[in-house]
Amino acid sequence: MDRYNPPRRNGNSKKNEVVITGGRTQRIDFEKDVNKTTILPAGASVGRRGRGAGWYCEACNETYKDSLSWLDHLNSTQHLRKTRTVIIEKRATLEEVKERMEYWRRQLLEPEKGSEEYSLKERVERYHQELEAKKLRRKQKKVNKEKNSPRLVGENTELAAIMGISSFGSTNL
């Protein structure tokens, strides 16, 4: 009997078994409960104890309001003790380190398929092209507006010119 394997109270209880794990290999899914409705008790919003709005740990009976504190809790000694989990760090060999460094070097040199390579010059050039297209659209809109606007014709034009009236409407020309 060692410190991680205390004696069992009843012979076949899985609750008392120690789980030995290494580092996390899977990602923690923070979005699994997004857009789900949960009914909470009346006093659920006060404190960390008990079920409430946020991430709930059944082993520790605590609720966490943000993902950072939830992740900290999952790695805390309190949670690991309650879930009877022992994390053993495996020391990497020289070959594994070299292999991992080679993998990341290849990742840096080869951009992912289907994604554009980051180029500042291209982005600036594209931005200027979009600005020019926007200016051209504005100019076309202004020309179309002037074509379609009603003009004074005949004698009324002369009379308006004598009176100093050039147009009706806004002062922006």
From Swiss-Prot:
Keyword Zinc: yes
Matrin-type zinc-finger residues: 55-85
CC terms in the record's Gene Ontology section: cytosol; nucleus; spindle pole body; spliceosomal complex; U4/U6 x U5 tri-snRNP complex
GO biological process: mRNA cis splicing, via spliceosome; mRNA splicing, via spliceosome
Domain of life: Eukaryota
Alphabetical keyword list: Coiled coil, Cytoplasm, Cytoskeleton, Metal-binding, Nucleus, Zinc, Zinc-finger
Matching InterPro entries: Matrin/U1-like-C_Znf_C2H2, Snu23, Znf_C2H2_jaz, Znf_C2H2_sf
Subunit record text: Component of the 25S U4/U6.U5 tri-snRNP particle, a subcomplex of the spliceosome.
Protein name: U4/U6.U5 small nuclear ribonucleoprotein component snu23
Lineage: Eukaryota, Fungi, Dikarya, Ascomycota, Taphrinomycotina
